[in-house]
Amino acid sequence: MTSSSKSRKSKSSKASKAAKEAPVSASRPLSKTPPPFRNQVIDKRALKQLVAWSYKNHGTAVTSSMADNLKDLGFKYATQAAVSISVDDLKVPEAKKDLLGQAEEQITATEERYRLGEITEVERHTKVIDTWTETNERLVDAVKKNFDENAPLNSVWMMANSGARGNMSQVRQLVGMRGLMANPQGEIIDLPIRTNFREGLTVTEYVISSYGARKGLVDTALRTADSGYLTRRLVDVAQDVIVREDDCGTTRHIVVDAEDGKFGSRLVGRLTAAQVVNADGEVLAERDTEIDPPLSKSFEAAGVKAVSVRSPLTCEANRSVCRKCYGWALAHNELVDLGEAVGIIAAQSIGEPGTQLTMRTFHTGGVSTAETGVVRSKVAGTVEFGSKARVRPYRTPHGVNAQQAEVDFNLTIKPSGKGKAQKIEITNGSLLFVDNGAEIDADVTVAQIAAGAVKKSVEKATKDVICDLAGQVRYEEAIQPREVTDRQGNITLKAQRLGRMWVLSGDVYNLPPNAQPVVGSETQVTEGQVLAEASQRSEYGGEVRLRDSIGDSREVQIVTTAMTLKDFKLLEESTHSGEIWNLEAKDGTRYRLNTIPGSKIGSGEVIAELADDRFRTGTGGLVKFAPGLAIKKARSAKNGYEVNKGGTLLWIPQETHEINKDISLLMITDGQWIEAGTEVVKDIFSQTAGIVTVTQKNDILREIIVRSGEFHLCTDAKALERFEGDGQMVNPGEDIAKGLSVDTMKYVQTVETPEGKGLLLRPVEEYTIPNVAQLPELSHVKQANGPHLGIKATQRLAFKDNELIKSVEGVELLKTQLLLETFDTTPQMTVDVEKAPDKRAKTISRLRLVILESILVRRDTMSDSSHGSTHTELQVEDGVSVKAGDVVATTQILCKQAGLAQLPEATEADPVRRMIVERPEDTTTLSTSGKPVVSVGQRIVDGDALAEGETASCCGEIEAVSGNSVTLRLGRPYMVSPDSVLHVRDGNLVQRGDGLALLVFERQKTGDIVQGLPRIEELLEARRPRESTILCKKPGTVEIKQGEDDESLAVNVIESDDAIGEYPILLGRNIMVSDGQQVTAGELLTDGPINPHELLECYFEDLRSRKPLMEAAQEAIANLQHRLVTEVQNVYKSQGVSIDDKHIEVIVRQMTSKVRVEDAGDTTLLPGELIELRQVEDTNQAMAITGGAPAEFTPVLLGITKASLNTDSFISAASFQETTRVLTEAAIEGKSDWLRGLKENVIIGRLIPAGTGFSGFEEELQKEAGPHPDILSEDPAGYRRMQNLRPDYTVDMPPAASASAVLDDPSDADLEATRTRHNIDPSASNFAAFTRPDADNELKEEQVVDAEAVEGLQEEGLLSDE
């Protein structure tokens, strides 16, 4: 030990000498006192302090060597002491047994209260969880105490206690108990793990424990991703915040208040914005003083309540932050340097701890009582509430009836004997467990004091109450159920008051849908007796077919309608593609079947198509309708056009080859006459003779058309003109041209050929189409009422008038189809296609279409718990005919156990679906020694009085009292809380496991979105919460009004001008203000999350009515900024992470820097434009000078993503998100990017304007300043940090950059010499006149040329004659 401390001393003395010799820096010197001698156990915290002290006073080198020595020291002694960990070091405290025993007792008592219906399921759950949580806490204390007293040098304890490894929660799991676990949904399982890892877990505990472990792993994985993305967004929003100025000179500031008289580290590293004075007016610090820890402590000592400090939030530097507003760079506790990228540092500081924040905590269900103080009575006596006392009944989360104070008052306990009265201060919201005037003993819990009027934000949650036994439901009077209709018209039943719902035991039978009970209510039944009977009937009647049964049911099919096509034989034909079925008529016409036997078809579908070659063409061609032929107008021509009226169809054949090949492959010329079989294009041959037309585009052959017919060269211009274009039909015997007539119908067209113009007479084919298609003969079987079938034949033309069919192969012009028609069917009904043998000739098959009604009949079940045993009988045989409404099968439900049958009341809307049999074991008879004090119909629970001095041992409803015996029908009570949704009505029958009610309860919003990463994200993204709190818009006095329907409340705020602001409060919202309270704008009227946008609006609207626009905007923004910074800090603090305010302020500044222009006034701004507040301010100042109308605007809050996308730099925005949108908009608006931030410069590939690259940036700024050398004579700002630099950096001071070179670049000495020789007055002459104005320099000032100077320079040969 001695040697190392010596070496450390010598080193530190050297370092301090060195420090003394070094020049003292400009900032306040830190304390140079030697470290105080620490006579204590050095644990993690003390080590941290030691290292920090050394770093501050002696720099890095000394500190690192000291840390090294400390490490060696630690290892040396750890080795000698042999600190290791073994199983024997895990000592389980003796107290564990007792603690667990007490917890078990409490829980048993709670379970008993639940069984007796004194508390609801929710209250039971809450109590169990709170009991275990408390036991766990007490066990941790026992563990600490055990180690501290019995084994202070135990390795495990030393590690956890010194902070070297592990923490108390881990030690708790090793030697205390593992505690409660959450299931994957985040609800806590109310079965805790009672053992620890030393004792070992049971199998069940191990499985439950692995839930929690998995949750931890998944959470960590998600958290890293989320936190990384948060950091990326933060960096993007703040990357262009760089310290660019020394002092912006602002007078604006923020105020830091002392918390409990202490500032902690919140002032350290800031600069004061005004003098700080103590109560006597003595100045403690001037403006712009850096506050270091001693100064902060002296403020506390002087009792300063609040200090005004400069902050990045109020800095007026343009698009950056100045050194004095930012304060210390926390890395080395000195004023921040110019060119420091403080935005990036802020983003990393906030993003990095993100991984330490929990994603979501567990839903504890219920609120643990840690934050409230329990007060017990010190004396026995009488309780007296003060005169101002106002209380209301309240039921605690554990189901204890108490009272809640509505105002602050004093409670006194007057002692019954001698002694001093005990006074207790009761605050608003505290719970009282005693009544006014009650006599109490000493050490009784009197009250639970709430920590201030903290109304926590709560959320609605629900829990189902599941029935544990089958039986009949009975409500207690107290419940007072009422029907509530929601917007959709659904009716729900809700409990109005706290009360019990009973389930009286019995055997409940579920009846099938159409079953009728065959026994009356209140009749005795025996085992095996039929209780109810269900019958299944045929709807339409018909012929019965029994199918083979499948599974536990069998199908009865009834043929309702059948139709046979008796003229057609059904033939099967095999082809390579599968089976084809044909229908053949007597005359040999064939129809091809579109379906196969055994399949189903619907109405309007095609059954078969006529296979007819009469309407098949040889090639493609042109369709023309002769007059008289008409088709139905159809929406889609997919299936062709239905023929309305028969007639003649004319067909002009032509052959079309679709080619799409290069023109070089063409082997004929356009307009040429060719014979059949000519090769027109390589490997493509014409099938007919005729005239060729070639279509080509861009040297690609598209089509070749061959039009057949007779070709006549013609010179008659009139005739040629007549048949130009599409051509015309010519009837037989008509003259076409001189000496040319036709004897059959022709289609004539004018064509051009290599030989010259002529007429082409094309043949026309005629097809006759009948008016109607012939229908086959049918035989039909159908019922008197019910569905029936029909067949309809239709003719469909594939093409319409004047349609050109481009094809080489032939096409079918007309299709004749048979369609199925159905009448009076239901949508679910389908038609079955069957193959049926002919009645007379068995070898011939016919096509039959049938409609079947299918009835599923259940098989017998022996005894299924809820249906009893059933017995099913079929009442029909295969092949018989039944009428509509005949019974096909009957099912009987048999009684399982003898007893008394009871039926619930049936209504039209609600037929009997269940019945109950009260068995002997559902009742019990209790005998009493005295006369019973109970009456029939009364419901009692364990412990209620039966007779004098005798209590009941079970729960139920009294059915009979005779002499000294009481007959009780067993039952079970369930407590339901007000506003619960009741799933069953009074008298309903329930099976075990049915839901009885849905309890609606409030639980504290779990620390969840209220904490951790999701909350940080919600704040920084400025998200609008789903159901936000109601905010007060104008200041005033609160008045709470009841709504018209006694349900809703309204808060009225009487404002200063006697106007009344009305705020209706929705159901389920808690009001956070009380009658007569004074409220300010932006104050919360109800609980719930705050919408930050709405808050900003409230602040701004209120301030706008009293202050000028600019001030109102600045103040509203400042209020919101303060709120945001506090909220973000709260989340981090709750998780034990400390971040300096200034980092959050830098980010919040970026979020609140813009305003939205509402009315542009006379400025060039656009309404709706988002623009920096500073820009608007400058614009409006300019307007004020010129007398124009200023722009009106409202401040806006942008989330970090929005803010990143709305930066001035489009390069930065595009590299973040929505690249295309950002770039397109920037291009359309013609934006310029000034490359001010880091990202833009990195993307373009320039030096970044921070750190060492900052000076270059400064020079560019100076270039913008134009040709004024006097600006350059000051030392460039980037090097003002010279004196603050650490000794191990050296920087060469560069020469001041000149604006732009004089033409022949004379040196300063030359110029000076010239001046002296020519007696030029240096003050009058302007040498800058000889500098060329930069091309991009807009300051091309009018500069007077000094003639004398020019002459002198020319004589010296320093200036060319030009």
Swiss-Prot record:
Keywords for this entry? Answer: DNA-directed RNA polymerase, Metal-binding, Nucleotidyltransferase, Transcription, Transferase, Zinc
EC assignment: the record states 2.7.7.6
Entry note: cofactor: Binds 1 Zn(2+) ion per subunit.
A single Gene Ontology MF term assigned here is: DNA binding
The Swiss-Prot or TrEMBL record lists the needed cofactor(s) as:
Zn(2+)
**What segments bear the compositional bias annotation Low complexity?**
15-27
Does the record carry Metal-binding as a key word?
yes
Q: Name one GO cellular component term.
A: DNA-directed RNA polymerase complex
Residue stretches of biased makeup (Basic residues)? 1-14
- Which InterPro entries does this chain map to? DNA-dir_RpoC2_beta_pp (IPR012756), DNA-dir_RpoC_beta_prime (IPR045867), RNA_pol_Rpb1_3 (IPR007066), RNA_pol_Rpb1_3_sf (IPR042102), RNA_pol_Rpb1_4 (IPR007083), RNA_pol_Rpb1_5 (IPR007081), Rpb1_funnel_sf (IPR038120)
Q: List the catalytic activities from the record.
A: RNA(n) + a ribonucleoside 5'-triphosphate = RNA(n+1) + diphosphate
Annotated Zn(2+) binding sites? 248, 315, 322, 325
Function recorded in the entry: DNA-dependent RNA polymerase catalyzes the transcription of DNA into RNA using the four ribonucleoside triphosphates as substrates.
Quaternary data: In cyanobacteria the RNAP catalytic core is composed of 2 alpha, 1 beta, 1 beta', 1 gamma and 1 omega subunit. When a sigma factor is associated with the core the holoenzyme is formed, which can initiate transcription.
- Report the sequence similarity comment from the record: Belongs to the RNA polymerase beta' chain family. RpoC2 subfamily.
The cross-references to NCBIfam families, in alphabetical order and at most eight, read:
PRK02597.1, rpoC2_cyan
The record ties this protein, via PANTHER family, to: DNA-DIRECTED RNA POLYMERASE, DNA-DIRECTED RNA POLYMERASE SUBUNIT BETA
What is this protein's record name?
DNA-directed RNA polymerase subunit beta'
Gene behind the chain: rpoC2
